[in-house]
Amino acid sequence: MTRRVALATAVVFAGLAAGAAAAPEAASPPLAKLVGARLVVGVDSTTASPSLLARIRRGQVGGVILMGSNVRSAPQVRALTTSLRAAATIAGNPLLVMTDQEGGTVRRFRWAPPSASAEELGSLGEAAIRRRGHETSTALERLGVDVDLAPVADVPSVPGSFIAAQHRGFSPVPTRTAKDVTAFSAGLLDGGVAPALKHFPGLGLATRSTDDAAVTIDAGASALAPGLVPYRRAIAAGVAPIVMISNAAYTAYGGQPAAWSPRVLALLRGLGFTGVTVTDALEPLATTHRVTLAQAAIRAARAGVDLLLFVGPERSTAAVYDALLAEARAGRLSRAGLEASAARIEELAATYAG
């Protein structure tokens, strides 16, 4: 059993959602490091560019995401993640390596499980779903991946749901989705990989993907409540170390994109969630709302999202880092908020990274 699996197994049985012990006091880190820890960036090719490795060594990047374009073979991926980790080790900074391995059509490593979609997995029962989660995490851990941006916790309960059309939801029944999401998440943790439940507070009522359009879910809080059921259960079970925040806007929660909404973040924390939050890819949000990448990131950071996710060219995020650092130095991003996010990210990395 690897150290990561042992730690992750302890998390499952201890119940992470009940809250973790506070970290010992230490000297305040510089703003540059606090800002860098929050950026998750894409990799431009099947190898890491010199500029990306340099940014990791300088502490300007806290994580990377691997997409299909970064994948040629298992040995190649392992060499890539090893080089990324080596750069982080030189700097003494944690680095989270992420991917999307939901199953079905959303699978960056085509040879790795789960081959079945969430919809197909939903017919297998909780024990089998947990096994599939464990198989997935075992494969990802061998590749050097720490975080799976899965499972989808959305409840596709309306006609025309894009989640249902893409077979990405476990069930239209909230309690069934809750059980299946909890089982798959527990399976990922069994193998030492952190799950990231998505897309809070739910995309089950959306008929279009936020990757393609600005989406507003015009529903009351009572209509949205069933979409919170999977999160409540997974948080209570201690199998939700990470939650991804939706790019959709919700009229019930103020009408701005959830990733920019302090109200949505407060709703999640009110469910007892003490882990790390991450945005969905910020490029589509910036495009559909006609703002720069830096503006999209700043708004999410101000709302309280911990990790800011970018899947496009790595070089495009250098200006984002500079803009965030300028906001921090001007006091428009509070040090207290930056330190709180950094503490959550460091705890996550201590358990799963490497």
Identify what each model region corresponds to:
Residues 23-111:
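N-terminal hydrophobic targeting/anchoring segments and the immediately downstream early-domain regions
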Residues 37-43, 62-66, 95-101, 147-151, ...:
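Hydrophobic faces of well-ordered beta-strands that scaffold small-molecule active sites
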